[in-house]
Amino acid sequence: MLRDQTDNTMDMDVLDDVPISDLNYETIQGYRNRHRALKPAHPFGRLNDSEYLRSIGAAAISNIDKCLHPTAAGMLMFGDEYNIVRHFPEYFLDYREILDPTIRWTDRLQSSSGEWSGNICDFYFRVYNKLVKDIKVPFKTIDGNRIDDTPVHEALREALANCLINADFYGVRGIVVRKEADRIVFE
């Protein structure tokens, strides 16, 4: 997008009026645990939470008060929905499973439900698990270890991540992921 063609993109903006405590601690810990499991020797694993958030671009030192605050990206990724919408009023994530055409939906997950954090990170993992639950996994081993990942799993991860990462949360429409009997739609 034209507005992102600078050295500092809008998701790097420091939210000077937001304390770092407005980020969801459980989401951050879950993300860090996944990072540790995937890359146990990564140097970020030794950082405290504040240093970690700075290292991944989720927080930065404000030029105004010289304190650590979430960035726009950090708020979207790790904030609670009720805090996110203060900065992104049209923010909305919606997963709809429509497997029976006679029913409006058979499963639904909305960022605004209040039943979970509503942030991008938690949405990604919750929705990914819903998308892949019906995928057939053929028996395959490599070096004696069972491989449960298929090219379809990889494609779904990539499509969901791209949909969320490349979304314009400053715009007027949220993200809708629809799982239907014969297709998956990202919009």
State where each predicted segment sits.
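Active-site helix-to-loop segments that bind/position phosphate- or nucleotide-bearing substrates
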Residues: 1-187
